[in-house]
Regions:
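Short glycine/serine/threonine-biased micro-segments
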Residues: 8, 230, 270-272, 294, ...
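A conserved structural/catalytic subdomain of Rossmann-like adenosyl-cofactor enzymes
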Residues: 2-4, 328-331, 335-567
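Non-catalytic, mostly N-terminal accessory regions of nucleic-acid modification and defense proteins
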Residues: 1-253, 319-322, 328, 434-437, ...
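Alpha-helix N-cap/helix-initiation motif
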Residues: 2, 189, 193, 230-233, ...
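Conserved S-adenosyl-L-methionine
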Residues: 233-352, 357-359, 364-373, 386, ...
Length: 567
């Protein structure tokens, strides 16, 4: 599928969502919409594995295809006709049965062993009745059993799957909510409409894993745009994610040598819907690199579930990622609380977009927490440095961390000044990047990116003032590929550009009391033109003489005409 088609699929699904949600809160409708898209992915992926597993035994009667693989004719954006994979082949035939349901009916004695085998191979099982194709058939026929079937299907996938990444995956999807309708039949009818429209919209497009993943990501972005301040809880705009991923995928000690071949592990400790982690993965794979393990932590249960779905929808195997539902500040994940320093998890790359100036309640014991012991505990009024120190603690000695923070961390006093000073004296702050205002859905304030390393080589800090480099949009300002590329290239080669970037020695920073306010070091103001006073004076004298000469000549003419002279 072309990039244009992928974008059009996302827009089609968004238009469906915008039309169908009615008075329902966008965040609530988002969870239903994305869960159904995810069920479509699970079904397609599972049926493909089933077909491979059963081989010649897979029912191939005419009209019976896996849900989502029938060919339909559609019109592409350029007006040409094309064949597309359609989910409306979701049923095997007119009776609504899928090929898998036919096999189950013909081989009842083999079902248990077959499902055991599928759990071992794909780590989850979807019963025929719960496949997307069967669900769409119920929706299109306005079957009263749809809601009940969905509830049972979600529960089965969660409880009967082999991998822990499926546990509680649909826990926040309340199919019995009054928001869908007061009575069962109203809720069932609403779900029939939603699912039928999703199936209709997707029928026009080929929907492989990458396409579904991109559509999912597009919808997350659109819902984020409509969520205002809440968007910051689960979504980092792609333009900002691209900067962070571009930085951490370069060689950590010698960025100018280019991209790394492998990241053994990458961490985002406030991962939201996972868009930032997936951006890092995309950066690595597009250049032929690999990632060993993707690790994330998310406090919000709904967003945590969105993240796990997002990973799977982008083709990340459940063995390749681990997302934990928990609180980063209290560090309640046993995996990260390893008491033996030799066994402490460490990451090649750490990326994060934590909540800005988050109020927290650090207890007295926090001063002894290994994450904060060397630098200090962030104040209650702003946990920014607590998040930063958490990430730095788990960074490998040769790793690189890129974190988005408000500008206050660069100059605020008190305990934050002491933490900042210690980080600078220890040589951990490598680069400070100032971004334009109004890039986020959740806030209009300008933010910065801090790049940190445990063993950085240059005895200076690179400042990049990109605050004026943007395209003004109606709601949010935008960074073009050129803007993003310039930031990454400047970091990579530590380039110095007038009114844009500068390498500042530690002595100068120390002389400024370790204040990192970007405008102190890189001003975007146009320099005033120097005036040569002697030359200017000579020019004015010459002009004055010219005026006097012209006036004298003019007065001669006036005298001949009998008129009074000019003064």
């Amino acid at each position: 599928m072309t990039d244009l088609d992928q974008k059009q699929l996302g827009k089609t699904l968004w238009n469906i969502a915008d039309t169908l949600r009615g008075a329902m809160n966008a965040d609530d409708f988002r969870d239903y919409m994305l869960s159904f898209l995810f069920l479509r992915y699970l079904s397609d992926n599972y049926e493909a594995a089933v077909k491979k597993e059963l081989g010649a035994d897979f029912p191939a009667a005419e009209g019976r295809e896996p849900s989502g693989t029938a060919e339909v004719s559609s019109t592409s954006p350029d007006g040409s006709r094309r064949a597309a994979k359609s989910p409306s082949a979701q049923a095997g035939g007119d009776d609504g049965r899928t090929s898998l349901s036919v096999w189950y009916a013909d081989n009842p004695g083999d079902v248990a062993a077959f499902e055991k085998q599928m759990r071992r191979k794909v780590h989850y099982v979807v019963k025929p009745d719960y496949l997307w194709g069967s669900i769409v058939y119920l929706a299109k026929s306005q079957d009263g059993k749809l809601l009940d079937t969905l509830q049972k299907g979600f529960k089965f996938i969660e409880e009967e799957s082999f991998s822990s990444n499926f546990q509680g995956l649909f826990s926040e999807i309340n199919l019995g909510s009054d928001k869908l309708g007061r009575r069962y039949d109203e809720r069932n009818a609403k779900l029939c409409s939603i699912i039928s429209e999703i199936a209709r919209g997707m029928a026009l497009f080929s929907t492989d894993v990458d396409t579904l993943g991109d559509a999912y990501e597009y919808l997350i972005g659109q819902f984020a745009a409509g969520s205002g301040k809440k968007a910051g809880e689960f979504y980092t705009p792609q333009q900002i994610s691209s900067i962070l991923s571009g930085i951490v995928t370069l060689d950590s000690q010698e960025p100018k040598t280019g991209k790394r071949k492998k990241l053994n592990a990458v961490l985002d400790f406030t991962c939201g819907s996972g868009s930032l982690l997936l951006n890092v993965r995309h950066r690595m794979t597009e250049s032929g690199g690999t990632i060993g393990k993707i690790v994330g932590m998310e406090k919000n249960i709904t967003t945590y579930n969105l993240c796990r779905m997002n990973m799977l929808l982008h083709g990340v195997k459940d063995t390749e990622f681990e997302i934990y539902h928990g609180d980063t500040l209290t560090n309640d994940w046993d995996y990260l609380r390893e008491p033996n320093p030799a066994k402490k998890p460490a990451f090649d790359a750490v990326v994060a977009n934590p909540p800005f100036s988050y109020r927290w309640e650090p207890g007295e014991a926090m001063s002894e927490d290994m994450r904060f012991k060397a630098h200090g505990v962030a104040p209650k009024s702003a946990a920014d440095f607590a998040f930063l120190l958490h990430g730095l603690h788990y960074l490998k000695d040769d790793g690189v961390m890129a974190i988005i923070l408000p500008h206050g961390v660069l100059f605020r006093g008190g305990v934050e000044e002491r933490i900042r000073t210690k980080l600078l004296q220890d040589g951990h702050i490598d680069t400070v990047i100032g971004l334009p205002a109004n890039l986020f859905y959740s806030t209009g304030i300008p933010v910065c990116i801090l790049v940190l390393k445990k063993c950085k080589k240059p005895d200076d800090v690179l400042f990049i003032n990109a605050a004026e480099q943007f395209v003004k949009g109606k709601r949010q300002n935008q960074l073009t590929d050129e803007h993003i590329g310039r930031i990454i290239e400047t970091y990579q080669y530590r380039k110095q550009h007038e009114r844009y970037s500068r390498r500042v020695k530690m002595k100068e920073i120390e002389a400024n009391d370790f204040n990192l306010n970007i405008s102190r070091y890189v001003s975007t103001a146009e320099a005033e033109e120097e005036i040569d006073l002697a030359a200017t004076h000579a020019e004015l004298v010459a002009i004055e003489k010219s005026i006097q000469k012209a006036t004298a000549k003019h007065n001669e003419f006036l005298k001949e005409l009998g008129l009074p002279p000019l003064p």
